[in-house]
């Protein structure tokens, strides 16, 4: 009875919020959780409960995966609003759950999830799949070191969850031997856009986590993501789903022998497309089904908007605040487009989210490369 009351309360508050033209994506769930903080444990979830997490790219990956699944006729409940912490997730789940049977009405529950909130949201065995995009230096005042985030994610799941990981990131690739359940890996082979040396001398995850010798990189995609090997072969970069022949000018690449369109001519578009492809395949979709969604019904990019202003074309890029690699990718996009251009950059130079006046992440951005 308590669960029924919580579900009805959440739905009622959501409708009241909409009546007053408020989003109502977070507050209703917070009220429901105050009644019973463990209400999400009482929900009957669908066969597939997929989480997507990481320092950056989780929103784009979630959107792309939702597009692929819906294009193939699956009923997908997902947090399209971007509310990825506990209260927002609770609002989404309760609003899509039958108040009397407590069954979530979907084929797939797909969630963009903040790395620090997975454990606070679900019990360890709730997620059937977890996609991990990358682990980088991100929002340092809140998250601290990348190692802390890795351990938070690892402690949030058990052997019942399949992890789908970006093997190009040595931090994330540690799940290949630390996680006790099934592991699926994806990565992008050497491209014409790679660097032989990193932009910054302070590269995270530069050493093998097993033998502790310095990793040997054939090439760097960006940051510490790239093609690498351990000198003693203790730590292996292996990919089940592989991106080849990346062509940003034509917005395409090859995934496991199939030519795939990208919806944006930036490197991280290749990553979130490959991650979504891998996850969709792991839950049973065929290459043909995935290719149709990517190549025939292309998803419009939300992070890159093109506008017209006084007969000029304006590209507006959205980068994640307090994440240096996200800014670097935007700068790479600008640098790769030749010809004269006017550049306007904006950011909150001091974090307003915490009591700390943290600006350290700005110094890790290479503005002159």
Language-model segments: residues:
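Gly/charged, well-structured mid-domain segments that form the phosphate/adenylate-handling core
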Residues: 247-248, 279-319
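Buried hydrophobic packing segments
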Residues: 65, 69, 89-93, 273-283, ...
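Cys/His-rich short segments
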Residues: 191-251
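A short glycine/serine-rich beta->alpha loop
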Residues: 76-79, 259-267, 315-316
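A conserved, hydrophobic alpha-helical segment in the catalytic core
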Residues: 124-134, 224-238, 264-295
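Phosphate-binding loop of NTP-binding sites
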Residues: 2-187, 197-207
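Active-site beta-alpha connecting loops in nucleotide-dependent enzymes
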Residues: 318-369
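Acidic-glycine-rich active-site phosphate/pyrophosphate-binding loop
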Residues: 59-67, 244-257
